[in-house]
């Protein structure tokens, strides 16, 4: 029969061959015609490099087939192959050597059969038919050798037509290998195949075991749509890039095209469309990106930091990350350290489950933040979803699936976008970030699907402190949903919230539209009292205010109640109890304030000012303060600037040591005054005070204690007569 051989110059050679001819024979015929030595020839058919010892019929090469001839580059070089045991093998190779050739060289050196070798470079598994130069492997590059696990198994591939293909595979096969097997069976080119498992599109460079695909698993095959189109990518500098793409292109492909045009590495690119960050493994059509759509390109900030991940066993893992890392990236790092597959990981921060496509900076996760790792329970089960039309959908799920995952499965079955779905179970609307097990949804449970009315709107929630919270809601949201949104923003448990609108308390099971709450309406949030009690607040004018409070109320809450009664803004209030100024973030119970206790209200003087603090070393510190700041506050500011703990600080002004509970205005400290900072010596001691009656009192003091402080010790009643004007006592100091 006749076959054709096409060279890179475009020339076509015609050869007379037989199906039983080896590739070696064919190369000899080419040498006879063109004078090219066989060892400089590489023959390619259907995307594969042909091996010398195989025949044309082995490759299903038939009459009038066309082979492609590529010349091997001359240029010997050394590369290194590192094994998992740490051993490094040195190989003499050429850039034109195939991965298959390299494996043969490894077999010659180490005796490992090629079919048990997996070679990795730059994080990718290398394919037998490709060359070293295809992967940009240069002299002294290091490849990593991983041995294939022996464990052949069958998997199934289901097409959209309903046909099921059976494949013989190994857990270590790459998705690319699987696509090649599908091509062998069905003739579908790999670049037209998309493989889906557990709702995820599988990436070429990953292995079946990476996705936990086991024997008799079923993959779904979707053909890529052919249909080129233009899209635009806008950078933060305002530049617009035009790209030729297909709906079936992955986000990874798009980033590669941007790299080709602009030279920006894919790992520094974040693509945004319709306010969402796009995930590498998803396609443009997955995000409904159509011709002439505009994506926004944001560069990832380079700024490594450490975060901690705490497991339920109490173990803490340290990770090196960047603010721009996605949660998916973080899970991959945890897998590298701990061997836990990403799909079994749930990461929690500030009480929220983190979503794969979002970044650490999206969640305001900063250096030395701690995430909590919860393992997903393995245990597939069936649940039912009932629509308002009466139709029942059956879903295969796991207890650890999020509501978001469930909505995605409904979208796969019914085509309803997740943002139009509301799922109800036991009378409650289910939140995207929570799991089925969080709601105690078990096998054969029935969820109810309600379609969202299109009509998002903003409402405001005003607290007793005067703070206004803005919420994104829909008229169909229940009051329970609204309370959950408030909890997400403010951390207030729903059972401590009372919402008031138009003078009425709102009931959990009713919706905003039931109460005619429309866009930009304002609700009022009142906290439910836990264990109410009365306290009194006495002002400098002598007026006494009675307040209903709870031990768990913060000082901030108390100030808000005073504002409600007296109209005094919280930032002008100072509350004093037992001689101490009370801090906003602390609770009444923190200060042991009980029923019928009396607080004292002092108004803050308006007037920020600068003061100076001079240390014994001669250094001068400048502080921004108010006359109403306590000495304790000032010491805290010094700690912020200089790192000196407050209990080691003594502040002196006009020859007097300043007391923590007093304010700057109490000492007549005005703008640009200078305080002196003396460090307390660590070294407590006992002294004795002998009275004229012969009684001896023992006191625990420090060398830095003032006489005034000694007079105020627990025996202060006894010592009240000791003052500058009274006769001196016979005190012996030891």
Curated annotation (Swiss-Prot):
One term under GO cellular component: mitochondrial outer membrane
Site, as annotated: Interacts with activating enzyme: 54, 72
PROSITE patterns xrefs: UBIQUITIN_1 (PS00299), UBIQUITIN_2 (PS50053)
Pfam families assigned to the protein according to its UniProt record, in alphabetical order: ubiquitin
InterPro entries according to UniProt: Ubiquitin-like_dom, Ubiquitin-like_domsf, Ubiquitin_CS, Ubiquitin_dom, Ubiquitin_ubiquitin-like
UniProt modified residues of type ADP-ribosylglycine: 76
Positions of post-translational Phosphoserine modification: 65, 141
Positions bearing the Glycyl lysine isopeptide (Gly-Lys) (interchain with K-? in acceptor proteins) cross-link: 76
Record location of the Glycyl lysine isopeptide (Lys-Gly) (interchain with G-Cter in ubiquitin) cross-link: 6, 11, 27, 29, 33, 48, 63
Entry keywords, A to Z: ADP-ribosylation, Cytoplasm, Isopeptide bond, Membrane, Mitochondrion, Mitochondrion outer membrane, Nucleus, Phosphoprotein, Repeat, Ubl conjugation
Superkingdom in the source lineage: Eukaryota
Site note Essential for function, residues: 68
Residue ranges constituting the Ubiquitin-like domain according to the UniProt record: 1-76, 77-152, 153-228, 229-304, 305-380, 381-456, 457-532, 533-608, 609-684
More info: Ubiquitin is encoded by 4 different genes. Uba52 and Rps27a genes code for a single copy of ubiquitin fused to the ribosomal proteins eL40 and eS31, respectively. UBB and UBC genes code for a polyubiquitin precursor with exact head to tail repeats, the number of repeats differ between species and strains. For the sake of clarity sequence features are annotated only for the first chain, and are not repeated for each of the following chains.
Family of this protein: Belongs to the ubiquitin family.
Identification of the protein by name: Polyubiquitin-C
Natural source organism: Mus musculus
